[in-house]
Amino acid sequence: MAAEEVTLSSHIQHHLTNAKMCSTDAGLAFNKACADSGFWTWHVDTLAWSIGLGLIFLWIFRSAAKKSTLGVPGKFQCFIEIIVEFVGDNVRDTFHGKSKLIAPLALTIFVWVFLMNLMDLIPVDFLPSFAGFVGETAFGMDSHDVYMKIVPTTDINMTSALALGVFILMVGFAIKIKGIGGFIKELTLHPFSSNNVFVQILLIPFNLLLELIALVSKPFSLALRLFGNLYAGELIFILIGAIGFMQLPLHFVWAVFHILVITLQAFLFMMLTIVYLSMASSDNH
């Protein structure tokens, strides 16, 4: 057991494992007991951190709105206004339809994803070790059976949920602008078309297959891009932390670089969402 605890592979696996909760015939079960529970398993750390960071986002912007003034703004108000104007400019330049939903949606996505990514800069052992200490002292659990992933975007379930929301909005916008008939025509009459009715009917299955692949690949790529970059970043932090005293300068260099990564990934997720919704709202194929 001791040898297992100190191996690098077990250390990495422990840090990259979610805290799980599931329902069994015997009642609620946690972590390893949920190994065979399948789809109906809750990643409680992902849920807790993502909801908590979402509430922090709402609190920050609500506080800024309440304290805003028409006079000389303070530093906090200026900072919030810079973010709002930055997102607003990107929405105006990219989204060519008319919707009051897009700018607030883009702002929410950018800030929320950024805050979730930002958790990757917290030392990898700090909060998981604290959770293990609490589990061991307060609940008599083995600290190695206590899991906590503090970066929600390193969980494919979280990024998939975000991408699924974008996908639903894409389909909703397309149906709202083009109607159900127009949406079906877009899926079945493009990219191949013919003036011959019989040929066009024969082309429908091929068009439908290609358009469905193109449609589904958009949220799929959104989810995997965000997850892959943040998961790899977290893994590198763990590997750096395993090399001893030399980790400090390497941690600093990687953290500085990773600040760019987490910001860029939040920006890309926001921009691609705007682009996809703009494409869905366009009357032109």
UniProtKB/Swiss-Prot annotation:
GO cellular component, one term: proton-transporting ATP synthase complex
Cellular localisation: Cell inner membrane
GO MF assignments: proton-transporting ATP synthase activity, rotational mechanism
InterPro entries: ATP_syn_F0_a_bact/chloroplast (IPR045082), ATP_synth_F0_asu (IPR000568), ATP_synth_F0_asu_AS (IPR023011), F0_ATP_A_sf (IPR035908)
Superkingdom, taxonomy of origin: Bacteria
Pfam families reported in the protein's UniProt record: ATP-synt_A (PF00119)
Keyword annotations of the record: ATP synthesis, Cell inner membrane, Cell membrane, CF(0), Hydrogen ion transport, Ion transport, Membrane, Transmembrane, Transmembrane helix, Transport
TM segment ranges: 41-61, 102-122, 164-184, 197-217, 226-246, 252-272
GO biological process entries: proton motive force-driven plasma membrane ATP synthesis
Cystine pairs: none
Membrane topology annotation: Multi-pass membrane protein
Summary of subunit composition and partner proteins: F-type ATPases have 2 components, CF(1) - the catalytic core - and CF(0) - the membrane proton channel. CF(1) has five subunits: alpha(3), beta(3), gamma(1), delta(1), epsilon(1). CF(0) has three main subunits: a(1), b(2) and c(9-12). The alpha and beta chains form an alternating ring which encloses part of the gamma chain. CF(1) is attached to CF(0) by a central stalk formed by the gamma and epsilon chains, while a peripheral stalk is formed by the delta and b chains.
Family note: Belongs to the ATPase A chain family.
Purpose: Key component of the proton channel; it plays a direct role in the translocation of protons across the membrane.
Protein name: ATP synthase subunit a
